[in-house]
Amino acid sequence: MLVLLCVDGQTDLSFLDRLQQCGGLQGVTNLTVVPRFTPDVADAVRQKARAYWPDAMPDDAPGRIILLDPRTLPRRHGLHLLLDALCRQTGAVLAFGDDMAIDRHGQVSDPWFKPGFDPLLAARGMLPGPMTALGLDRLRNPLAVWASLRGDNTEPDDPLMTVLAAVSRDEVLHCPHVVAFRFERAVRPRRQIAPPVPDPLPTVSIIIPTRDGWDLLGPCLDSLGRTDWPVAQREIIVVDNGSSDPACLAGLARAEAAGSVRVLRDPRPFNFAALNNRAASLARGELLVFLNNDTLALRPDWLGVLSAFAWLPGAGAVGPKLLYADGSVQHAGLVFGLNGRAVHVHVGLPSDGGGYQGLATTSHEVSGVTGACLALRRAAFEAVGGFNEGFPVAYNDMVLCADLMKKGYRNLYVAEPLFLHLESRTRGNLDNPEKHRREADEAARARALHPDLFAADPHYSPNLSLDAPYVPAVPPRRRPPWDLAGNPSPPAD
């Protein structure tokens, strides 16, 4: 087994002694140190490790290698877990696992139980992690990766990013076990760079169902009127589902006469999915934005932010961070399977609160976003047939997101607080037995449509509980290899 230790000018050379003492390199036959940026230090570490790094990729280069950050200790079984996962998965090029912090007394804390691979998290340095296994013989251009590992480029680069740029997401495998300990308590992410706004700008249709409630809809429309998107390339469609309140009827008439909205009258019994589907079929936008009437836009550039993420390759539903009126988090993505339902996570955090490993303040892939503010390209919406009208009140947004994932789209949470959401003020909360029964029924039918997603949300680690979000599962929901082999416990660390 070959382990590549990536070092820089700040590396403590005693690190190699710690590796050997902890047994983390048990079974390693070749420890090679990658010289990074500082030749003197690289030479010293080379000598201490009694290893070398060839200038050119040799013909007998190993097929499997481990990339190891010097601030990391492998668990005794960690290297083997990664290599085993890489070898078992046909087509996998890179495997990564979970990690925990460790202090100088050997106490562990701060587990980072990771989701499946996510390019947005990888671009921020939160994935893959400090120890990864690489199938060098499976790369289409191994020479470029070899050069990056040696630090041949004029500008220092991250060899992992070079690898990730050369592979597809299906070739990156997550091994959901703690494989390494890190000497830093928390992940220190790079600054997240927002994607560019589409050029040319797409036409946008904003669709808002309502029945009465002008005290909510009026301020919502006022906030949308401050949007900086060109007026000629946006439209607001209000679906009037049988309003009878004079104030609402008068307000809609004024807005329609002013040309600021189109009013689509649809007095059928309330069916959120059907109302939105009909409006979408009559809309002219390339980008569809479904919005509750109890929302308030907080920034004039909100459409630019959402459209930028919606135009990323493979993007499905896109939803921003939503805040309650008091400024705390109402929505920061959905996790499927928690207590058998699809559940909002990070609810109640301060607007700038990081939540679990900073996910609340990091745009990333999720399995679902709320229909209270949901943007997606028309092509993606039509590819799944729109909202499932068998879910008239609840779970229509979650089923839409699940349908998109099944078609290969990726749903995205945008960690920008773009709207206030006065949650369910128009329909009320689930405050009576009938509403509870209906919500439970729609949850059960959603599980029946997408059982695999509710059983194992790919964006939520199996090491995390299904009883409460982002707390460790006891025991973990994924059995480790030694358990499958009939051994009750792992090798001791």
Positions of predicted regions on the chain:
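A short, conserved alpha-helix in the catalytic core of glycosyltransferases
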Residues: 138, 150-176, 302-306, 360-385, ...
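Acidic donor-binding segment of Leloir-type glycosyltransferases
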Residues: 19-57, 225-268
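A recurrent flexible, glycine/aromatic-enriched loop bordering the glycosyltransferase active site
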Residues: 108-138, 273-274, 281, 337-379, ...
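A short, glycine-/small-residue-rich helix N-cap motif at loop->alpha-helix starts
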Residues: 41-54, 267-274, 280-283, 297-298, ...
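Conserved donor NDP-sugar-binding/catalytic core segment of glycosyltransferases
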Residues: 77-109, 169-170, 295-341
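C-terminal, non-catalytic tails of nucleotide-sugar-dependent glycosyltransferases
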Residues: 1, 186-205, 316, 326-327, ...
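Short aromatic/hydrophobic "clamp" motif used to bind/position activated sugar donors
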Residues: 65, 288
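N-proximal low-complexity "stem/linker" segments adjacent to membrane-targeting elements
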Residues: 1-24, 180-226
